[in-house]
C-alpha cells in the first residue's frame, strides 16, 4: 500500500483514535479501523462489505473517513460501493445527509457522492443535486457523474438548471461534462434553458434513460463546437488544463507516411519510422517527433484565448521530468511567450517516466483536464540501463491520483507500437478521457 499523504494521515489518526466512532466492540466499524491500523487492504475491503451488510451510523462514518484517508484504490472502491448500499437503508438517510453536508474535506464529499452514484435508488438525486453548486470543482464534477450513473429521469432537471448557471456558452470542462451527461440521459443537446424546460414538460412522463439508444442522428438545438483551439488536430475543449509532453530520446525518430518503411541495418528489419540518429547526439531533425511536438505545442500556446488557464509538464528521465508552473496560469501575452520559450529550449532525455509525469500533472492546482502526449511505454533508468515500469502500476497510480480530483485525462500517441497504443488507450479510458493516434505524418 502507498504511504499516506500528510493531510490524509492526520485524518486517519483522528479516526484510529476512535474520537468519532462510537461503535460496539466487534462491530464492522471497529473491524475497519483495526484493519486500517494494520494497513491490511483485504481486511479493510472485507470490513467495508460487512458494514454494507449491517449498516449503522458508526459504520457510515468509518467508511467516509477511512475511505478518504487510505490511499488505495481497492479500499476506496470498497468504501464507495458500501456507501451506496448503506443509502438503501431508509433509517440512515438522515445521518447520510448529515455526514455529507458536514464533510469539510472535498475528498470526503467526493467519496460520498461517488457512493451515491452506485445506488439504484432515485432518492439519491435530491441529496446529490445541491452539490452541483459546491465551491469545489471536483465535487461538482463528481455530482454530475453520479447523477448520470443513476440513469433516472429525475437527474435531468438539476443538470440543465446547473448548465444554465454555468452558461450554455461556457467552454469550461464542467459545461462539457453537463452537456455530455444530459445528452446521455435524454438524447438532447439544447443550448437554451427555455428549450430544456419545454422539452422536459412534454417528455418527463415517458423518458427512461435506461432504454435510450444513441446514434449519430440524435438531435437537439445544435451540437456544440466550442474549443480553445487544436493541437495535432485534436480539439482542446477545456479552459483550465495541463499539457504533458514526452521528451524521451525515442522522440528523435521520424515517422513515415502510411505504407512506407525504412530498413534499419542494425536491427535488420523494416520499421514504420526512420532513426537517423540512434545515439541521440545530433540536433533533432525538423520532421522528428520531437520537433513536430515542439511546433504543435508552440502554435497552440500562441493561439490560446485570454480566458484559458494552463500549465505544462515535460517528462523523460527523473531529473528531466518537471513542471513549468505549479498552478494553471492565465494565457496572457507574457505567460504565453514564457511557455513558448520553455518548450523551444527543451532537449530530449533518456527513459520515459510516465509515472512521475502523472504525479506532476495531477498536482497542478486549478486544472480540470490533462492532455497527455507520448510515444512510448513507461520506462526508468536502473543500474545504467533502461527498464520497463509495469504498465498496470502506472494505470493504477493514475486512478489513485484521480480518485477525488476527477480530471479528464486525454492521451495522444505518436507511436507505431501496438503495446504503447494499448497502454495509452487504457490510461485514457480509466480516467474519463479519449485516445487519439497522432503518429502518421502527411506526405
Model-identified regions with their sequence ranges:
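Acidic, polar low-complexity linker/tail segments
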Residues: 23, 197-279, 326-328
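Amphipathic alpha-helical scaffolding segments comprising HEAT/armadillo-like alpha-solenoid repeats
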Residues: 24-35, 56-68, 88-101, 121-133, ...
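Short inter-helical turns and helix N-cap capping residues of alpha-solenoid HEAT/ARM repeat scaffolds
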Residues: 39-40, 71-72, 104-105, 135-136, ...
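Residue-level detector of extended alpha-helical repeat arrays and alpha-solenoid scaffolds
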Residues: 44, 60, 75-76, 109, ...
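Conserved hydrophobic register position within alpha-solenoid helical repeats
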Residues: 47, 79, 112, 143, ...
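Von Willebrand factor
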Residues: 107, 169, 285-294, 298, ...
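…and closely analogous acidic/polar surface helices at protein-protein or active-site interfaces
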Residues: 239, 250-312, 328-335, 347
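VWA/integrin I-like adhesion module and closely mimicked acidic/polar interface patches used
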Residues: 264-268, 344-346, 376-431, 436-438
Amino acid at each position: 500500500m502507498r504511504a499516506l499523504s500528510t493531510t490524509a494521515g492526520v485524518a486517519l489518526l483522528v479516526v484510529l483514535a476512535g474520537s468519532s466512532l462510537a461503535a460496539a466492540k466487534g462491530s464492522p466499524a471497529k473491524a475497519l479501523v483495526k484493519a486500517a491500523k494494520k494497513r491490511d487492504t483485504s481486511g479493510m475491503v472485507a470490513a467495508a462489505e460487512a458494514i454494507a451488510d449491517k449498516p449503522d451510523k458508526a459504520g457510515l462514518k468509518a467508511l467516509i473517513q477511512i475511505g478518504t484517508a487510505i490511499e488505495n484504490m481497492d479500499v476506496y472502491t470498497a468504501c464507495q460501493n458500501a456507501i451506496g448500499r448503506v443509502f438503501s437503508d431508509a433509517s440512515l438517510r438522515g445521518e447520510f445527509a448529515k455526514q455529507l453536508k458536514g464533510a469539510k474535506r472535498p475528498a470526503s464529499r467526493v467519496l460520498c457522492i461517488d457512493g451515491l452514484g452506485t445506488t439504484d435508488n432515485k432518492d439519491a438525486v435530491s441529496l446529490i443535486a445541491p452539490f452541483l453548486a459546491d465551491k469545489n470543482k471536483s465535487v461538482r464534477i463528481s455530482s454530475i457523474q453520479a447523477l448520470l450513473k443513476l440513469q433516472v429521469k429525475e437527474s435531468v432537471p438539476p443538470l440543465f438548471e446547473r448548465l444554465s448557471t454555468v452558461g450554455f456558452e461556457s467552454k469550461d470542462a464542467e459545461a462539457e461534462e453537463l452537456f455530455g451527461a444530459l445528452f446521455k440521459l435524454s438524447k438532447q443537446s439544447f443550448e437554451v434553458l427555455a428549450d430544456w424546460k419545454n422539452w422536459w414538460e412534454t417528455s418527463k412522463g415517458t423518458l427512461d434513460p435506461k432504454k435510450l439508444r444513441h446514434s449519430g442522428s440524435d438531435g437537439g438545438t445544435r451540437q456544440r463546437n466550442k474549443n480553445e483551439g487544436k493541437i495535432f488536430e485534436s480539439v482542446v475543449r477545456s479552459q483550465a488544463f495541463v499539457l504533458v509532453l514526452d521528451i524521451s530520446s525515442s522522440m528523435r525518430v521520424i515517422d513515415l507516411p502510411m505504407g512506407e518503411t525504412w530498413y534499419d541495418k542494425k536491427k535488420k528489419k523494416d520499421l514504420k519510422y526512420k532513426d537517423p540518429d540512434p545515439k541521440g547526439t545530433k540536433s533533432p531533425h525538423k520532421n522528428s517527433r520531437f520537433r513536430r511536438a515542439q511546433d504543435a505545442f508552440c502554435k497552440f500556446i500562441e493561439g490560446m484565448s485570454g480566458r484559458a488557464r494552463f500549465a505544462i509538464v515535460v517528462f523523460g528521465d527523473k531529473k528531466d521530468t518537471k513542471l513549468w508552473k505549479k498552478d494553471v496560469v492565465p494565457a496572457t501575452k507574457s505567460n504565453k511567450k514564457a511557455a513558448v520559450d520553455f518548450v523551444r529550449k527543451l532537449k530530449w532525455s533518456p527513459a520515459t517516466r510516465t509515472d512521475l509525469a502523472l504525479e506532476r500533472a495531477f498536482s497542478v492546482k486549478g486544472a480540470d483536464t490533462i492532455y497527455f502526449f507520448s510515444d512510448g511505454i513507461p520506462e526508468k533508468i536502473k543500474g545504467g540501463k533502461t527498464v520497463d515500469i509495469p504498465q498496470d502500476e502506472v494505470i493504477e497510480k493514475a486512478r489513485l491520483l484521480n480518485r477525488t480530483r476527477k480530471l479528464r485525462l486525454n492521451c495522444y500517441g505518436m507511436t507505431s507500437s501496438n503495446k504503447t497504443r494499448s497502454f495509452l488507450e487504457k490510461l485514457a479510458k480509466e480516467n474519463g478521457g479519449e485516445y487519439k493516434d497522432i503518429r502518421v505524418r502527411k506526405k
